[in-house]
């Protein structure tokens, strides 16, 4: 007669681990904070507000519900703004956001306005006292378990890059250094990219942070060349993965993706479906990060991002032949 041993502690530990891994991961929420700085005159104030509204409305159309817009002049659009973009209000907005964001949520921050650089540190110009790059670094440190996409479109924004770059962050600046202090053209094209079919190079119905960056940078270069001027701004992106991670970030929930491949030929449709599956794997891996060995997480992430980059290239190559 064969006897069976009663389940021991190891069995129950393994069972609990299996159940934890099998449980569906919580959905990632997207949070957007848009800040416009001092315009200096009515023309610039109006322009910065116009861009901010375009970003806010684009995000809301795609299902982003947590949107905060702090404006230099809230009276321009009381229905859309949540307050004036003073140092105090910006700090409060970051602190409030840190209080409601869950682990693995995605935080998008966009600065639209003028910047400055005193030779030592950069700042974004606000009504009243400014916030420096170091100040924003302190605010971003509140988000230890979220991914941050921080887009500073201002002049001299390159001074923010080294201060803010780090694990779990994608930093976009309109200039490469703090010394590039001329008014930037980058923001107009970056905002335009969010709703541009031309920017959606992989035709998945959404524009990634990398696609918006590449689109805007290319448009800026073309504009300077067309006018015969020397390029005075060099946009920069740092996500720690040579842009591979930025290619998976969207200012839109995953469920908002259009069925871009529905009418594609079978070969292209297959590539699009494979690319979408890889994006899903990246998202699921990020949700499991806290329960994984750091080295294994980085190894698996690097493989997925490389596979995703190759798949995206294959899609573009196939479309280019048509």
Regions of interest found by a model, annotated:
Residues 1-7:
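N-terminal secretory signal peptides that target proteins for export/translocation
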Residues 2, 25-322:
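Cysteine endopeptidase catalytic domains of the caspase/legumain-like
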Residues 7-8, 27:
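Low-complexity, intrinsically disordered short peptide segments enriched in small/polar/basic residues
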Residues 8-22:
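Bacterial N-terminal signal peptides
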């Amino acid at each position: 007669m064969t006897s069976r041993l009663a389940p021991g502690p190891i069995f129950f530990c393994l069972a609990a681990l299996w159940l934890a891994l099998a449980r569906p991961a919580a959905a990632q929420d997207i949070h957007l904070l848009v800040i416009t700085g001092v315009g200096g005159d009515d023309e610039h104030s109006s322009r910065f507000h116009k861009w901010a509204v375009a970003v806010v409305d684009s995000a809301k159309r795609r299902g982003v519900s947590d949107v905060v817009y702090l404006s230099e002049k809230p009276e321009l659009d009381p229905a859309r703004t949540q307050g004036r973009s003073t140092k105090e209000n910006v700090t409060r907005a970051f602190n409030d956001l840190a209080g409601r964001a869950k682990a693995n949520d995605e935080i998008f921050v966009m600065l639209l306005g003028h910047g400055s650089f005193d030779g030592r540190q950069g700042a974004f110009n606000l009504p009243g006292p400014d916030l420096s790059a170091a100040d924003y670094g302190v605010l971003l440190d509140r988000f230890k378990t979220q991914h941050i996409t921080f887009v500073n479109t201002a002049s001299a924004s390159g001074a923010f890059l080294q201060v803010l770059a780090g694990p779990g962050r994608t930093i976009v600046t309109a200039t490469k250094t703090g010394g590039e202090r001329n008014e930037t053209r980058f923001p107009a094209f970056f905002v335009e990219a969010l709703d541009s079919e031309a920017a959606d190079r992989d035709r998945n119905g959404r524009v990634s942070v990398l696609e918006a960056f590449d689109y805007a940078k290319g448009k800026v270069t073309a504009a300077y060349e067309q006018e015969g001027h020397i390029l005075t701004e060099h946009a920069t992106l740092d996500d720690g993965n040579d842009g591979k991670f930025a290619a998976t970030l969207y200012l839109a929930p995953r469920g908002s993706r259009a069925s871009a491949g529905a009418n594609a030929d079978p070969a292209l449709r297959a590539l699009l479906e494979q690319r979408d599956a890889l994006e899903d794997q990246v998202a699921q891996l990020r949700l499991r990060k806290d329960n994984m060995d750091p080295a294994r997480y980085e190894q698996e992430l690097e493989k997925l991002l490389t596979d995703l980059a190759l798949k995206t290239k294959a899609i573009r190559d196939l479309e280019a032949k048509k």
